Amino acid sequence: MNRLLICALMTVALSAASSAVNAAKIERIVTPGGIEIWHVHDNMLPMISLEFGFVGGASQDPADKPGVANLVASLLDEGAGDLDARAFQERLEERAINISFSAQRDSLRGSLKTLVDHHDQAFDLLRLAVNAPRFDSSEVERVRAGVLAGLRRRTTNPGDIAGDRWFARAFPDHPYGRPVQGTLETVARIGIDDLRAFHRNTIARSNLKVATIGAIDAQEIAAFVDRVFAALPQEPQLVSVPEVVPQGGGEQEIVDLDVPQTVIAFGGIGLKRSDPDFIPAYVLNHILGGGSFSSRLYREVREKRGLAYSVYSYLAPYDRAGLFMGGVSTRNDRAAESLAIILDQIKKIAEAGPTAEELAKAKSYLIGSFPLRFDTSGKIAGQLLEIQLENLGIDYIDRRNGLIEAVTADDVRRAAARFLANARLLVTLVGRPDPVPNPAPATAGRG
């Protein structure tokens, strides 16, 4: 039995997932060690999925060494305890166990997927990875080389360049302005002491969120979660990350790159997830640029004029900042036209709001598509973790569609007035746009 089996099982859809995963069936468990778990007991597959996150993430990187969190995440399963990297990976492979870690701006996250028959060994391996990563010098250098190779590729990828440059200009002197992956220079300077310090300061019990689903009861999962996490320090030693708003509103940066298309990234102030107007703003953005084939941006940029294959906007609610962002990739000689259309559509929806038909269709789609977020056990655990990290409450799944349905035209107009009307965007273009677009007007996005 190998990882192909676990992958096959994980892709089996869970029928009636959204109705099965509701607040009545999500158990809130507090382990003997004091760790809170949101658990769904499900016997449909002989599987257990666990998702967890530590609040902190890349925002905890030293200011002069971005990339530490990402390198730590890449190394946690590369040898732990008395198992070197090869032995650790062999144990995973032999038992079809999948363990992975990732770093984001506001959290360090991990995932475990295992067959029930191997859950004892799986949780033991996860315990070692979380508590006793080796950070052997040979593995650090091997993984570092892979990260550096990826960073070299990013230096020639227009989309990556646009995103990194946008964040750097929007958040100077703030952790959000530093790339999660680091840079070629900073990753080369990260030492093993930096990795150990990040692990020691960030991974603790009080900033831990855990979500599980599978063929295991509450008492068993509590014991296994304690086995993994109970020996961690109670409190992390986190660096305070200040609230921030994106800078550079109305500014435009062109990064010269010899490519046939220009990639445009734009953004400004949005709303944080805790904001009462976030749901109306979410519905509004779906109409503007979040609804793929149904959005105004898609219709005007792609469908009517054929300027781009993809154009989009989205809300990005970070812990310390709420953002409204978007992007498009188009021919160099059509970049100015594409950007002008995007800004014009933002202006129009900010001033007049959506039509009644647009609002009704958006709400219907957002409600009807919600079950797709829960059609595998991995997705369910991931959603439960996300809800915890965003402090939405254990009953959010039950409440969410009602919140969407309750959005009125007045709600949407109010949200638009807060983050789109009389606003200014920071725009980054990567390529060789000709003609050069005019800077974003004052009515198109706020920075």
Model-derived segments and spans:
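C-terminal regions of mature proteins
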Residues: 168, 209-212, 328, 360-447
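A structural supersecondary motif
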Residues: 58, 265-269, 289-330
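M16/MPP (pitrilysin/insulinase) zinc-metallopeptidase core fold and M16-derived inactive scaffolds
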Residues: 26, 51-116, 156, 179, ...
